[in-house]
Amino acid sequence: DEIDNVDLLVSNLTASSGGSEQEDDDRLRERIRLAPESFTNAGSRGAYRFHAMQAHPNIVDVAVLSPVPGTVDLYPLLSTGLPDGGVLTLVESFCSDEKVRPLTDTVRAKTPVKVDYTIEARITIYRDQDARSVKDAANSAIQNWVASRAATLGRDIVPSQIISALSVSGVYQVELVTPALRVVAENEWANCTAITLNMSGVSDD
């Protein structure tokens, strides 16, 4: 723009980052449920969880642990996965405010422990079914199951659930090769690194 014969150029010198999509209904409901916890600075688990989720719009879950009296460890999970150092610093700063925590508490923000696993299964279908269509349906179903595990912290990896998810219409039998049962701690995050579905045969039964 020209002002009094002076040309002004306005530009952003720093690349924008860290934006987020509009808050989804599940996250909004969770924040509303936790809101009464924010009225106290007595250091309840719910209060720390509420304030940690307020620190960044992409935080969808927070594990709150106290390994020793007076120390609170916060493990935030983002909608995009594990947090970076910037988010951890933000959460720690936000939850260390004296209006949030008791004076005797030391707050530490930590990265959730990633639990990698793979899914491999052998699928037998009915003879009159189209193998490609059944495989596509099974793949879609297991992708949804994997996403449900990754949406929050502490979701166990249960073989019977995987078999159930893969048992879509047209499937006669599912033989699961991996994974084995894995109980996931509340500060751990289940992360599927690969899915392999092998169409192993057909059945007339």
Predicted regions and their residues:
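A broadly tuned preference for mixed-charge, low-complexity surface segments
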Residues: 24, 112-133, 167-184
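Beta-strand/loop-dominated core regions that host nucleotide or nucleotide-derived cofactor-binding catalytic loops
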Residues: 1-14, 88-93, 191-202
